[in-house]
A protein has these predicted regions:
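Glycine-rich phosphate/pyrophosphate-binding loops
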Residues: 65-77, 96
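Small-aliphatic-rich amphipathic alpha-helix that forms the alpha element of a beta-alpha
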Residues: 51-65
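Glycine-enriched alpha-helix->loop->beta-strand junction motifs that scaffold or abut catalytic
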Residues: 41-43, 63
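Thiamine diphosphate
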Residues: 1-10, 16-39, 47, 53-56, ...
């Protein structure tokens, strides 16, 4: 089972519950998990072809007419519609749901498909949710479609779960593991790697707290401060390019709030787009596997 499959099945259930729910794809019905939706709801399924910008603009128009459009699209392809994301969706605060597949390092799909630019977090009024498990994808998509207002993006990776199967509920920030020496702040598919890193460090006598962000934009300042209370040394781990991503925004937030953070180490994709390679290979090369994150904690404590 994959995140794409779980998305498609969940959206079909939501469409059964609310006739306003519609699905949009840009020539990627199979890849995004929408083939079942298209068969069950042919009049509520729209394929705009290889025209992601048009898909966003069309979703905005549908939202203005009272529908609930869900645009399922690969992260790297949605970049083409950035102007429409701002002008035809965010500017008017329209309730469009973006189901953003292939976020982060994608491995087998190749270097053109990496979703490592955190561009959605820069759009005013955009809420960005980041599930780390199938259960979280189900509940986050349900909330995004039926309970939330304005533009919402649910970002999830290629493939299946990485070992973490929890469900954060509607919390924006969750402490998954207590610790006193340092904190690892992460989100999405890297959650399990962070938990494994904390286990490795425990064997060395290092107590690492693991803080999971479920909503990566806007950041929940009060929730983050509560989660990091008492810890002064922090590692932020994410499979995104560093510029404008969670790590940089977290650092600015903690500084602005005077949280007393003594040292922050950012573990990210860095400043260069990832090359070809498997997910395991690329995580290891970038220091985003369990051992790499553990090493970042050692550095922040040095």
């Amino acid at each position: 089972e994959t995140f794409s499959h779980v998305f498609g099945e969940t959206l079909r259930q939501l469409a059964r519950e609310d006739r306003r729910v519609c699905a949009i794809t840009a020539a990627m019905a199979d890849g995004t998990g929408l083939t079942g939706f298209a068969r069950e709801f042919p009049r509520r399924f729209f394929d705009v072809g290889i025209a992601e910008g048009h898909g966003v603009a069309m979703a905005g128009g549908m939202a203005k007419q009272g529908l609930i459009p869900v645009f399922a699209v690969y992260d790297s392809f949605l970049q083409r519609g950035y102007d429409m994301l701002v002008q035809d969706m965010a500017l008017e605060k329209l309730h469009v749901v973006l189901a953003v597949d292939r976020c982060g390092i994608v491995g087998a799909d190749g270097e053109t498909h990496h979703g490592c630019l955190d561009y959605l977090s820069q759009i005013p009024g955009m809420t960005v949710l980041s599930p780390a498990s199938f259960a979280e994808l189900r509940q986050m998509l349900r909330r995004a479609v039926l309970e939330m207002d304005g533009p919402v993006a649910v970002r999830y990776p290629r493939g299946g779960e990485d070992g973490y199967e929890g469900d954060c509920g509607d919390e924006s920030v969750t402490v998954l593991r207590q610790g006193t020496d340092a904190a690892i702040v992460t989100y999405g598919i890297l959650t399990q790697q962070a938990l494994r890193a904390a286990e490795l460090l425990e064997k060395e006598g290092i107590s690492a707290r693991v803080v999971k962000l479920n909503r990566v934009a806007p950041l929940d300042s009060s929730g983050i401060c509560r989660a990091l209370d008492g810890v002064k040394r922090i590692v932020a781990a994410e499979d995104q390019l560093r510029a404008g991503a969670v790590g940089e925004r977290l650092g600015a937030l903690l500084l602005e709030l005077g949280a007393g953070t003594e040292k922050l180490v950012l573990r990210s994709v860095g400043t260069t787009l990832p090359s070809q390679g498997s997910t395991v290979e690329l995580r290891h090369a970038l220091g985003l596997d369990a051992e790499g994150i553990a090493q970042a904690v050692r550095e922040v404590l040095a």
